[in-house]
Amino acid sequence: MDVYQDIWNGSFPELITNPSVDRNRFFSSYMQTYIERDVRDYQGTTNDLKFYKFVRAVAVRTGNLINYEDLARDCDIDRRTAQKWLDTLQASGLVYLLPPYSSNLTKHIIKTPKMYFLDTGLACFLANIDSPEALEASYLNGSMLETHTLCEILKSFWHNGENARNLYFYRDANKKEVDFVLEKNMTLYPMEAKKQHCRAAMIVRIITFSKN
């Protein structure tokens, strides 16, 4: 299966196992239930329309550094509300915040986390991407591929009963960047998500180097 088909499908079992399910209706119902039940459990009453707009704003920024000012401006809310709402998305399992790698030897690095949607199918729905072909042609194809890669890495941790506390990304002030960095046994394992066009498949390039 082409990687963009896989990304667009997402990971909801109902959509994968039953092709007859109306995708748009499913995600619309999911978001309505999520806001009316889950979000109110975390933060009480909220402006549903603005919160939905906020979730969409996060979806089109998946794989990007958190910028509360941009989110607040686009959704006509203040920075404090943007931070509170992103915390809710994280706490409810809709979004994952990936921390930057840092050590005593890395002084000129970006210290802001990146935010990722934990289901790329839902992210595509919220971004109004209506097919795998539209996804591959869109400006979001790179960030969605990166998001998909992170989701697969996280699943490998969780399925083995492990957490991902040693997983990071790297970016310095000169914009040199590594998509993901795993720290294990005093060794860093940088990983880059790339599209292998000749076989329409996703590959992860892993380079190993010692912390020392």
Please report, for each region that a protein language model flagged, where it lies by residue.
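Interdomain motor-coupling "hinge/lid" segment immediately C-terminal to the ATP-binding subdomain
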Residues: 1-60, 64-65
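AAA+ ATPase "lid" subdomain C-terminal helix
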Residues: 15-21, 80, 93-96
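C-terminal helical "lid" subdomain and adjoining coupling/linker elements of P-loop NTPases
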Residues: 18-19, 41-46, 73-77, 100, ...
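Helical mechanochemical/support elements of P-loop NTPase systems and associated helical scaffolds
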Residues: 47-50, 67, 78-81, 118, ...
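A short alpha-helical element within helix-turn-helix/winged-helix DNA-binding domains
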Residues: 65, 70-72
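Short amphipathic alpha-helical interaction segments
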Residues: 76-91
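A cross-kingdom feature that marks ATP-driven nucleic-acid transaction machinery
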Residues: 87-88, 93-95, 99-212
